[in-house]
Amino acid sequence: GDRAKNAIFYTWDGTKWYFGPYDLDTTYGLHFNGTQISYAADSAPKTDSGTFWKKILVTYADELSTRYAELRDKDIFSVNCLYDIAAELSSKYTHELDKAEINKWPTKPSLTVTSRDQIFSWFNDRLAYLDNKFNYTR
């Protein structure tokens, strides 16, 4: 199931485990098939109801809130930072390469659903939700 959606746990020795991003097709609210925004930014992900994540959220509540506040205070977890990352990534690709991508994948469904503005808007709303969830105020 999707108990750890968009995440993977991995180990090299069976003792120390790592957590990383994986299969990010549903990021920023996008449905896995790319045809619609499937969940609102101000809603809890389905994974929050899973036993594993409930245990993590309860056991590490203080650490999660502290880390969240640190990332927000340093402007790392912000729309401005996301914008800078997107601009930096976009600068690596020429207009011709963008056109070639669209020509190769003309029926990519998310082309008509998402955009940078949609992502920034969704993320801004998500931050408001997370600020509330982690009791964060500036």
Where are these regions (language model features)?
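Middle-to-C-terminal accessory/interaction subdomains
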Residues: 1-138
